[in-house]
Amino acid sequence: MKSWSSRPVPELPGTGTAPRVHDTSTGQLEPLAARDGRASLYVCGITPYDATHMGHAATYVAFDLLHRLWRDAGWSVDYVQNVTDVDDPLLERADATGVDWRELAESQTELFRTDMSALNVLAPQHYVGATEVVDRIVPAVERLLERGLAYRAPAGTGQGGEPAPAGDVYFDVDAAGALRAEDPDAWVVGSTCRLAGERDRMMPLFADHGGDPDRTGKRDPMDPLLWRAHRAGEPSWDGASLGPGRPGWHIECSVIALDLLPRPFTVQGGGSDLAFPHHDMGAGHAYALSGQPMAEHYVHTAMVGLDGEKMSKSRGNLVLVSTLRAQGMDPAVIRLAILANHYRTDWFWTDELLEQARRRLGTWREAAAKQETAGADAMLEAVRAALGEDLNSPAALIAVDAWAARNLGGAAARGSGASSQDTRLARDTVEALLGVVL
Protein backbone atom coordinates (compact mmCIF):
# COMPACT_ATOMS: atom_id res chain seq x y z
CA MET A 1 0.00 0.00 0.00
CA LYS A 2 1.40 3.40 -0.92
CA SER A 3 2.20 5.94 1.76
CA TRP A 4 2.15 9.72 1.24
CA SER A 5 4.75 12.28 0.23
CA SER A 6 6.86 14.04 2.86
CA ARG A 7 8.56 17.42 2.73
CA PRO A 8 12.34 17.33 3.07
CA VAL A 9 13.37 17.99 6.68
CA PRO A 10 15.83 20.88 7.13
CA GLU A 11 19.15 19.97 8.72
CA LEU A 12 19.94 21.81 11.93
CA PRO A 13 23.34 22.69 13.39
CA GLY A 14 24.62 20.48 16.16
CA THR A 15 22.92 17.28 17.21
CA GLY A 16 19.84 16.74 19.31
CA THR A 17 19.84 14.37 22.25
CA ALA A 18 17.90 11.17 22.82
CA PRO A 19 14.45 12.01 24.19
CA ARG A 20 12.81 10.63 27.31
CA VAL A 21 9.17 9.59 27.02
CA HIS A 22 6.53 8.18 29.34
CA ASP A 23 6.40 4.40 29.01
CA THR A 24 3.00 2.90 29.76
CA SER A 25 4.60 -0.41 30.72
CA THR A 26 6.65 1.16 33.54
CA GLY A 27 4.64 4.27 34.34
CA GLN A 28 7.83 6.32 34.23
CA LEU A 29 9.82 8.54 31.91
CA GLU A 30 12.31 6.35 30.11
CA PRO A 31 15.26 7.29 27.89
CA LEU A 32 15.03 5.94 24.37
CA ALA A 33 18.22 4.39 23.04
CA ALA A 34 19.18 3.73 19.45
CA ARG A 35 20.55 0.38 18.38
CA ASP A 36 23.53 0.85 16.04
CA GLY A 37 22.27 4.33 15.28
CA ARG A 38 18.76 3.19 14.39
CA ALA A 39 15.41 3.57 16.11
CA SER A 40 12.23 1.76 15.16
CA LEU A 41 8.62 2.81 15.53
CA TYR A 42 5.29 1.09 14.98
CA VAL A 43 2.20 3.27 15.25
CA CYS A 44 -1.18 1.62 14.85
CA GLY A 45 -3.06 3.08 11.93
CA ILE A 46 -6.68 3.82 11.24
CA THR A 47 -9.66 1.63 10.60
CA PRO A 48 -10.68 3.58 7.51
CA TYR A 49 -14.28 4.66 7.88
CA ASP A 50 -14.14 8.09 9.59
CA ALA A 51 -10.83 9.66 8.63
CA THR A 52 -9.20 11.83 9.76
CA HIS A 53 -10.73 13.00 13.03
CA MET A 54 -8.86 15.15 15.52
CA GLY A 55 -8.07 12.20 17.78
CA HIS A 56 -6.31 10.53 14.85
CA ALA A 57 -4.48 13.73 13.96
CA ALA A 58 -3.29 14.32 17.53
CA THR A 59 -1.83 10.81 17.73
CA TYR A 60 0.06 10.96 14.45
CA VAL A 61 1.33 14.49 15.08
CA ALA A 62 2.65 13.37 18.50
CA PHE A 63 4.60 10.47 17.04
CA ASP A 64 5.76 12.72 14.22
CA LEU A 65 7.48 14.82 16.90
CA LEU A 66 9.26 11.68 18.13
CA HIS A 67 10.23 10.77 14.56
CA ARG A 68 11.67 14.26 14.03
CA LEU A 69 13.56 14.20 17.35
CA TRP A 70 15.19 10.90 16.48
CA ARG A 71 16.29 12.26 13.13
CA ASP A 72 17.63 15.40 14.83
CA ALA A 73 19.66 13.12 17.12
CA GLY A 74 21.30 11.69 14.00
CA TRP A 75 19.45 8.37 14.11
CA SER A 76 18.02 6.48 11.18
CA VAL A 77 14.35 5.67 11.74
CA ASP A 78 12.45 2.58 10.66
CA TYR A 79 8.77 3.53 10.84
CA VAL A 80 5.85 1.20 10.16
CA GLN A 81 2.15 2.02 10.22
CA ASN A 82 -0.71 -0.32 9.39
CA VAL A 83 -4.24 0.16 8.08
CA THR A 84 -6.95 -2.08 9.52
CA ASP A 85 -8.68 -2.29 6.17
CA VAL A 86 -11.00 -5.13 7.13
CA ASP A 87 -12.73 -5.17 10.52
CA ASP A 88 -16.22 -5.28 11.98
CA PRO A 89 -16.71 -1.48 12.30
CA LEU A 90 -15.66 -0.96 8.68
CA LEU A 91 -17.99 -3.70 7.45
CA GLU A 92 -20.85 -2.32 9.54
CA ARG A 93 -20.36 1.19 8.12
CA ALA A 94 -20.19 -0.15 4.58
CA ASP A 95 -23.39 -2.11 5.11
CA ALA A 96 -25.17 0.90 6.64
CA THR A 97 -24.19 3.21 3.77
CA GLY A 98 -24.57 0.71 0.94
CA VAL A 99 -20.94 1.18 -0.12
CA ASP A 100 -18.68 -1.75 -0.94
CA TRP A 101 -16.33 -2.18 2.02
CA ARG A 102 -13.26 -2.13 -0.24
CA GLU A 103 -14.31 1.15 -1.84
CA LEU A 104 -15.00 2.67 1.58
CA ALA A 105 -11.62 1.55 2.90
CA GLU A 106 -9.72 2.87 -0.11
CA SER A 107 -11.49 6.23 -0.21
CA GLN A 108 -11.00 6.83 3.51
CA THR A 109 -7.37 5.69 3.38
CA GLU A 110 -6.70 8.10 0.54
CA LEU A 111 -8.35 10.89 2.52
CA PHE A 112 -6.13 10.02 5.48
CA ARG A 113 -3.01 10.17 3.29
CA THR A 114 -4.04 13.59 2.02
CA ASP A 115 -4.65 14.84 5.55
CA MET A 116 -1.30 13.54 6.82
CA SER A 117 0.54 15.20 3.96
CA ALA A 118 -1.30 18.46 4.62
CA LEU A 119 -0.40 18.29 8.33
CA ASN A 120 3.25 17.72 7.38
CA VAL A 121 3.45 14.35 9.14
CA LEU A 122 6.50 12.42 7.95
CA ALA A 123 5.42 9.31 6.12
CA PRO A 124 6.27 5.81 7.36
CA GLN A 125 8.63 3.75 5.24
CA HIS A 126 6.12 0.91 5.34
CA TYR A 127 2.37 1.55 5.15
CA VAL A 128 0.67 -1.82 5.24
CA GLY A 129 -2.95 -2.88 4.92
CA ALA A 130 -4.11 -5.87 6.94
CA THR A 131 -5.54 -7.41 3.78
CA GLU A 132 -2.05 -7.35 2.25
CA VAL A 133 -0.59 -9.69 4.87
CA VAL A 134 -3.27 -12.35 5.30
CA ASP A 135 -0.93 -14.83 3.62
CA ARG A 136 1.59 -14.20 6.43
CA ILE A 137 -0.97 -14.15 9.22
CA VAL A 138 -2.31 -17.61 8.37
CA PRO A 139 0.99 -19.48 9.00
CA ALA A 140 1.52 -17.44 12.18
CA VAL A 141 -1.83 -18.61 13.56
CA GLU A 142 -1.04 -22.16 12.48
CA ARG A 143 2.24 -22.00 14.45
CA LEU A 144 0.41 -20.84 17.55
CA LEU A 145 -1.97 -23.79 17.21
CA GLU A 146 0.94 -26.20 16.80
CA ARG A 147 2.60 -24.83 19.95
CA GLY A 148 -0.52 -25.21 22.04
CA LEU A 149 -0.88 -21.45 22.44
CA ALA A 150 -4.10 -21.23 20.45
CA TYR A 151 -7.20 -23.38 19.99
CA ARG A 152 -10.26 -23.80 17.81
CA ALA A 153 -13.54 -22.91 19.49
CA PRO A 154 -16.57 -25.12 18.87
CA ALA A 155 -19.77 -23.80 17.36
CA GLY A 156 -21.72 -21.64 19.78
CA THR A 157 -23.01 -18.12 20.15
CA GLY A 158 -21.07 -14.92 19.62
CA GLN A 159 -20.82 -11.66 21.51
CA GLY A 160 -24.21 -10.39 20.39
CA GLY A 161 -25.93 -13.75 20.63
CA GLU A 162 -25.53 -14.48 16.92
CA PRO A 163 -24.57 -18.01 15.87
CA ALA A 164 -20.82 -18.59 15.84
CA PRO A 165 -19.61 -21.44 13.64
CA ALA A 166 -16.94 -23.91 14.62
CA GLY A 167 -13.49 -22.89 13.52
CA ASP A 168 -12.93 -19.54 15.22
CA VAL A 169 -9.33 -19.63 16.50
CA TYR A 170 -8.44 -17.99 19.82
CA PHE A 171 -5.18 -17.14 21.56
CA ASP A 172 -4.86 -18.96 24.89
CA VAL A 173 -3.77 -16.23 27.31
CA ASP A 174 -3.23 -18.68 30.16
CA ALA A 175 -1.01 -20.99 28.11
CA ALA A 176 0.97 -18.04 26.78
CA GLY A 177 1.33 -16.56 30.26
CA ALA A 178 2.72 -19.84 31.54
CA LEU A 179 5.84 -19.21 29.44
CA ARG A 180 6.97 -16.82 32.18
CA ALA A 181 7.92 -19.84 34.29
CA GLU A 182 10.83 -20.30 31.87
CA ASP A 183 11.54 -16.65 31.04
CA PRO A 184 10.95 -13.79 33.51
CA ASP A 185 10.66 -11.40 30.55
CA ALA A 186 7.86 -13.40 28.95
CA TRP A 187 4.51 -11.75 28.37
CA VAL A 188 1.53 -12.22 30.65
CA VAL A 189 -1.81 -10.59 29.98
CA GLY A 190 -1.71 -6.96 31.07
CA SER A 191 2.07 -6.81 31.45
CA THR A 192 2.67 -4.06 28.87
CA CYS A 193 0.20 -1.66 30.50
CA ARG A 194 0.63 -2.37 34.23
CA LEU A 195 -2.65 -4.28 34.46
CA ALA A 196 -1.24 -7.77 35.04
CA GLY A 197 -3.32 -9.56 37.66
CA GLU A 198 -6.04 -6.89 37.62
CA ARG A 199 -8.71 -8.89 35.86
CA ASP A 200 -11.54 -6.70 37.15
CA ARG A 201 -10.02 -3.75 35.32
CA MET A 202 -9.06 -5.62 32.18
CA MET A 203 -12.36 -7.36 31.49
CA PRO A 204 -14.46 -4.21 30.85
CA LEU A 205 -11.70 -2.82 28.63
CA PHE A 206 -11.56 -6.07 26.70
CA ALA A 207 -15.33 -6.02 26.14
CA ASP A 208 -15.40 -2.34 25.15
CA HIS A 209 -12.47 -2.48 22.74
CA GLY A 210 -13.14 -5.25 20.27
CA GLY A 211 -13.19 -8.27 22.57
CA ASP A 212 -15.88 -10.93 22.73
CA PRO A 213 -15.94 -12.24 26.32
CA ASP A 214 -19.43 -13.73 25.89
CA ARG A 215 -18.47 -15.97 22.96
CA THR A 216 -19.27 -19.50 24.13
CA GLY A 217 -16.64 -22.21 23.86
CA LYS A 218 -13.69 -20.04 24.84
CA ARG A 219 -11.30 -21.29 27.51
CA ASP A 220 -11.02 -17.82 29.03
CA PRO A 221 -13.45 -14.98 28.29
CA MET A 222 -10.42 -12.73 27.70
CA ASP A 223 -8.86 -14.93 25.01
CA PRO A 224 -8.58 -12.75 21.87
CA LEU A 225 -9.60 -13.80 18.38
CA LEU A 226 -6.85 -14.84 15.98
CA TRP A 227 -8.92 -16.11 13.04
CA ARG A 228 -12.63 -15.54 12.44
CA ALA A 229 -14.20 -18.43 10.54
CA HIS A 230 -16.22 -17.37 7.53
CA ARG A 231 -19.75 -16.05 8.05
CA ALA A 232 -22.24 -15.55 5.24
CA GLY A 233 -22.04 -12.06 3.81
CA GLU A 234 -18.56 -11.34 5.17
CA PRO A 235 -15.30 -11.17 3.20
CA SER A 236 -13.00 -14.12 3.70
CA TRP A 237 -9.62 -15.40 2.62
CA ASP A 238 -8.09 -18.82 2.13
CA GLY A 239 -6.90 -19.83 5.57
CA ALA A 240 -5.21 -23.09 4.51
CA SER A 241 -5.65 -25.47 7.47
CA LEU A 242 -7.61 -22.77 9.33
CA GLY A 243 -10.38 -22.79 6.75
CA PRO A 244 -11.80 -19.69 5.05
CA GLY A 245 -12.11 -16.60 7.22
CA ARG A 246 -10.33 -13.39 8.15
CA PRO A 247 -7.74 -12.41 10.76
CA GLY A 248 -8.41 -11.01 14.19
CA TRP A 249 -7.39 -7.45 14.98
CA HIS A 250 -4.34 -7.89 17.21
CA ILE A 251 -2.51 -10.55 15.20
CA GLU A 252 -2.43 -8.26 12.16
CA CYS A 253 -0.12 -5.77 13.87
CA SER A 254 2.00 -8.49 15.47
CA VAL A 255 2.77 -10.12 12.14
CA ILE A 256 3.46 -6.83 10.35
CA ALA A 257 5.83 -5.70 13.10
CA LEU A 258 7.65 -9.04 13.27
CA ASP A 259 8.11 -8.98 9.50
CA LEU A 260 9.38 -5.41 9.15
CA LEU A 261 11.02 -4.29 12.40
CA PRO A 262 13.76 -5.51 14.77
CA ARG A 263 12.89 -7.68 17.76
CA PRO A 264 12.20 -5.88 19.98
CA PHE A 265 11.60 -2.59 18.20
CA THR A 266 12.01 0.72 20.03
CA VAL A 267 8.50 2.13 20.46
CA GLN A 268 4.97 0.80 20.04
CA GLY A 269 2.72 3.84 19.75
CA GLY A 270 -0.94 4.71 19.52
CA GLY A 271 -3.87 6.21 21.36
CA SER A 272 -4.41 5.36 25.02
CA ASP A 273 -7.53 3.42 24.06
CA LEU A 274 -5.21 0.90 22.36
CA ALA A 275 -3.05 0.16 25.40
CA PHE A 276 -5.38 -2.67 26.40
CA PRO A 277 -6.31 -4.97 24.86
CA HIS A 278 -4.86 -4.17 21.44
CA HIS A 279 -1.23 -3.42 22.20
CA ASP A 280 -1.03 -5.84 25.09
CA MET A 281 -2.52 -8.75 23.18
CA GLY A 282 -0.40 -7.92 20.15
CA ALA A 283 2.66 -8.11 22.39
CA GLY A 284 1.48 -11.50 23.63
CA HIS A 285 1.13 -12.82 20.09
CA ALA A 286 4.57 -11.49 19.15
CA TYR A 287 6.27 -13.08 22.17
CA ALA A 288 4.52 -16.38 21.55
CA LEU A 289 5.72 -16.36 17.93
CA SER A 290 9.27 -15.08 18.40
CA GLY A 291 10.27 -15.73 22.02
CA GLN A 292 11.21 -12.06 22.35
CA PRO A 293 9.40 -8.97 23.62
CA MET A 294 7.58 -7.08 20.89
CA ALA A 295 8.70 -3.56 21.84
CA GLU A 296 11.09 -1.94 24.29
CA HIS A 297 8.66 0.87 25.13
CA TYR A 298 4.91 1.52 24.91
CA VAL A 299 3.87 5.13 24.40
CA HIS A 300 0.28 6.34 24.28
CA THR A 301 -1.47 9.59 23.46
CA ALA A 302 -4.39 10.99 25.43
CA MET A 303 -7.97 11.41 24.25
CA VAL A 304 -9.40 14.45 22.47
CA GLY A 305 -12.89 15.68 23.27
CA LEU A 306 -15.38 18.21 21.94
CA ASP A 307 -17.66 20.41 24.04
CA GLY A 308 -16.87 18.52 27.24
CA GLU A 309 -17.34 15.02 25.79
CA LYS A 310 -14.95 12.44 24.40
CA MET A 311 -14.67 12.74 20.64
CA SER A 312 -15.60 9.38 19.13
CA LYS A 313 -17.14 7.75 16.12
CA SER A 314 -19.91 6.22 18.21
CA ARG A 315 -20.93 9.63 19.58
CA GLY A 316 -20.90 11.19 16.13
CA ASN A 317 -19.11 14.31 17.40
CA LEU A 318 -16.02 14.13 15.23
CA VAL A 319 -14.06 17.14 14.04
CA LEU A 320 -12.47 16.12 10.75
CA VAL A 321 -9.23 17.52 9.37
CA SER A 322 -10.67 17.38 5.86
CA THR A 323 -13.69 19.46 6.90
CA LEU A 324 -11.47 22.16 8.38
CA ARG A 325 -9.28 22.15 5.28
CA ALA A 326 -12.34 22.42 3.02
CA GLN A 327 -13.38 25.47 5.04
CA GLY A 328 -10.06 27.08 4.12
CA MET A 329 -8.18 26.47 7.37
CA ASP A 330 -4.40 26.39 6.97
CA PRO A 331 -3.26 22.87 8.01
CA ALA A 332 -0.36 24.48 9.89
CA VAL A 333 -2.94 26.13 12.16
CA ILE A 334 -4.54 22.75 12.84
CA ARG A 335 -1.13 21.29 13.67
CA LEU A 336 -0.32 24.18 16.00
CA ALA A 337 -3.66 23.78 17.78
CA ILE A 338 -2.74 20.14 18.44
CA LEU A 339 0.80 21.00 19.58
CA ALA A 340 -0.56 23.49 22.12
CA ASN A 341 -1.61 20.44 24.19
CA HIS A 342 0.73 17.90 25.76
CA TYR A 343 0.29 14.53 24.09
CA ARG A 344 -0.43 12.74 27.40
CA THR A 345 -3.08 15.16 28.64
CA ASP A 346 -6.73 14.76 27.66
CA TRP A 347 -7.97 17.95 26.02
CA PHE A 348 -10.97 19.43 24.26
CA TRP A 349 -11.13 20.85 20.77
CA THR A 350 -12.68 24.32 20.67
CA ASP A 351 -13.04 27.14 18.18
CA GLU A 352 -11.03 29.33 20.55
CA LEU A 353 -8.14 26.86 20.49
CA LEU A 354 -8.13 27.04 16.70
CA GLU A 355 -8.27 30.84 16.77
CA GLN A 356 -5.36 30.99 19.21
CA ALA A 357 -3.34 28.77 16.87
CA ARG A 358 -4.23 31.00 13.90
CA ARG A 359 -3.02 34.09 15.74
CA ARG A 360 0.14 32.32 16.93
CA LEU A 361 1.04 31.20 13.41
CA GLY A 362 0.45 34.72 12.12
CA THR A 363 2.82 36.13 14.73
CA TRP A 364 5.50 33.56 13.98
CA ARG A 365 5.28 34.16 10.25
CA GLU A 366 5.42 37.91 10.72
CA ALA A 367 8.65 37.52 12.69
CA ALA A 368 10.07 35.01 10.21
CA ALA A 369 9.35 37.40 7.34
CA LYS A 370 11.87 39.91 8.71
CA GLN A 371 15.13 40.08 6.82
CA GLU A 372 17.21 39.93 9.97
CA THR A 373 16.39 38.46 13.37
CA ALA A 374 18.23 37.42 16.52
CA GLY A 375 17.99 34.69 19.13
CA ALA A 376 17.40 31.62 16.97
CA ASP A 377 20.31 29.71 18.53
CA ALA A 378 18.74 29.97 21.98
CA MET A 379 15.34 29.13 20.56
CA LEU A 380 16.70 25.98 18.91
CA GLU A 381 18.20 24.76 22.18
CA ALA A 382 15.01 25.54 24.09
CA VAL A 383 12.84 23.67 21.59
CA ARG A 384 15.19 20.68 21.65
CA ALA A 385 15.16 20.63 25.44
CA ALA A 386 11.38 20.89 25.69
CA LEU A 387 10.64 18.17 23.17
CA GLY A 388 13.37 15.95 24.58
CA GLU A 389 11.57 15.84 27.91
CA ASP A 390 8.50 13.76 27.06
CA LEU A 391 7.62 15.66 23.88
CA ASN A 392 6.65 18.82 25.76
CA SER A 393 5.24 20.66 22.77
CA PRO A 394 3.49 23.44 24.77
CA ALA A 395 6.87 24.46 26.22
CA ALA A 396 8.43 24.30 22.75
CA LEU A 397 5.76 26.64 21.39
CA ILE A 398 6.44 29.10 24.20
CA ALA A 399 10.11 29.15 23.20
CA VAL A 400 9.15 30.11 19.64
CA ASP A 401 6.70 32.68 21.00
CA ALA A 402 9.56 34.30 22.90
CA TRP A 403 11.74 34.44 19.79
CA ALA A 404 8.91 35.98 17.76
CA ALA A 405 8.10 38.55 20.45
CA ARG A 406 11.75 39.58 20.69
CA ASN A 407 11.99 40.15 16.96
CA LEU A 408 8.71 41.98 16.65
CA GLY A 409 9.58 44.34 19.50
CA GLY A 410 11.85 46.59 17.47
CA ALA A 411 15.60 47.01 17.35
CA ALA A 412 15.96 47.60 21.09
CA ALA A 413 14.15 44.38 21.95
CA ARG A 414 15.95 42.42 19.25
CA GLY A 415 19.36 43.54 20.44
CA SER A 416 22.62 43.08 18.60
CA GLY A 417 23.63 40.20 16.40
CA ALA A 418 20.63 40.20 14.08
CA SER A 419 21.21 38.45 10.77
CA SER A 420 19.50 36.78 7.87
CA GLN A 421 21.16 33.51 8.94
CA ASP A 422 19.28 33.75 12.23
CA THR A 423 16.00 34.07 10.36
CA ARG A 424 16.80 30.98 8.30
CA LEU A 425 17.76 29.02 11.42
CA ALA A 426 14.50 30.00 13.11
CA ARG A 427 12.45 28.84 10.14
CA ASP A 428 14.43 25.61 9.87
CA THR A 429 14.07 24.90 13.60
CA VAL A 430 10.31 25.32 13.60
CA GLU A 431 9.92 23.16 10.51
CA ALA A 432 12.45 20.44 11.39
CA LEU A 433 11.36 19.89 14.99
CA LEU A 434 7.73 21.07 15.14
CA GLY A 435 6.74 20.33 11.54
CA VAL A 436 5.34 23.85 11.02
CA VAL A 437 6.36 25.67 7.85
CA LEU A 438 6.89 29.40 8.27
UniProtKB/Swiss-Prot annotation:
Its EC number is 6.3.1.13. Gene3D superfamilies: Anticodon-binding domain of a subclass of class I aminoacyl-tRNA synthetases (1.20.120.640), HUPs (3.40.50.620). SUPFAM superfamilies: Nucleotidylyl transferase. A motif ('ERGGDP' region) lies at residues 208-213. It catalyses: 1D-myo-inositol 2-amino-2-deoxy-alpha-D-glucopyranoside + L-cysteine + ATP = 1D-myo-inositol 2-(L-cysteinylamino)-2-deoxy-alpha-D-glucopyranoside + AMP + diphosphate + H(+). InterPro entries: Cys-tRNA/MSH_ligase, Mycothiol_ligase_MshC, Rossmann-like_a/b/a_fold, tRNA-synt_1_cat_dom. It is an enzyme of class 6 (ligase). Pfam families: tRNA-synt_1e. L-cysteinyl-5'-AMP binds at residues 44-47, 59, 82-84, 249, 271-273, 304. One of its GO terms (biological process) is cysteinyl-tRNA aminoacylation. One of its GO terms (molecular function) is zinc ion binding. GO terms for cellular component: cytosol. Binds 1 zinc ion per subunit. Residues 1-27 are annotated as: Disordered. Its cofactor is Zn(2+). Catalyzes the ATP-dependent condensation of GlcN-Ins and L-cysteine to form L-Cys-GlcN-Ins. Belongs to the class-I aminoacyl-tRNA synthetase family. MshC subfamily. Monomer. PANTHER family: CYSTEINE--TRNA LIGASE, CYTOPLASMIC, CYSTEINYL-TRNA SYNTHETASE. This is L-cysteine:1D-myo-inositol 2-amino-2-deoxy-alpha-D-glucopyranoside ligase. It comes from Kocuria rhizophila (strain ATCC 9341 / DSM 348 / NBRC 103217 / DC2201). The gene is mshC.
